[in-house]
């Protein structure tokens, strides 16, 4: 739910539900929600850094900002990428966030604060089962990153655009070539 609309009503419904459970001392969903909300911008930032041929320069620059937003639990850092290519990007992000949330819940991770990204790690006892939480976050981020690699097409570079590319048939048909 956190990756479906990245800050939209579905995302906010999941977040609000988890925050409401904190008052009842139910802390597992908050951990899953925050980790799953961090996964989309982290995955896009990582993918933009690793797979430069699948992102233009503007997207690679936005990927750097997405990493900072991701560690801060600002899911909206993924919106520019999803808005540009929603049918490829959103399913990849949902898959990774689902993996993150599932590992977090299965591992019994609990988060006693409603926001803060990785900065909550500095608060003593704010995260129960921190190692499992980090594994969940890493696993989901890698799932989304790998999925993005598989579904995003390489972007044409400046030397491969149709206007500057010489067709192979032209060079092969010239005498002496």
Where are these regions (language model features)?
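Pore-lining transmembrane helices
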Residues: 1-162, 167-168, 172-176
């Amino acid at each position: 739910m956190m990756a479906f609309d990245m800050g939209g009503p579905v995302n906010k419904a999941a977040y609000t539900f988890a925050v409401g459970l904190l008052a009842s001392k139910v802390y597992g969903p908050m951990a899953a929600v925050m980790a799953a909300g961090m996964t989309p911008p982290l995955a896009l930032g990582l993918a933009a850094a690793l797979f430069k041929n699948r992102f233009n320069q503007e997207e690679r620059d936005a990927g750097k900002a997405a990493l900072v937003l991701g560690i801060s639990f600002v899911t909206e850092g993924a919106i520019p990428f999803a808005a540009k290519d929603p049918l490829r990007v959103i399913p990849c992000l949902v898959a990774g966030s689902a993996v993150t949330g599932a590992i977090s819940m299965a591992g019994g991770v609990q988060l006693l604060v409603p926001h803060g990204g990785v900065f909550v790690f500095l608060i003593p006892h704010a995260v129960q089962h921190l190692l499992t939480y980090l594994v969940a976050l890493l696993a989901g981020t890698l799932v989304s990153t790998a999925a993005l690699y598989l579904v995003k097409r390489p972007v044409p570079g400046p030397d491969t655009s149709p206007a500057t590319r010489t067709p192979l048939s032209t060079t092969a048909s010239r005498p002496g070539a």
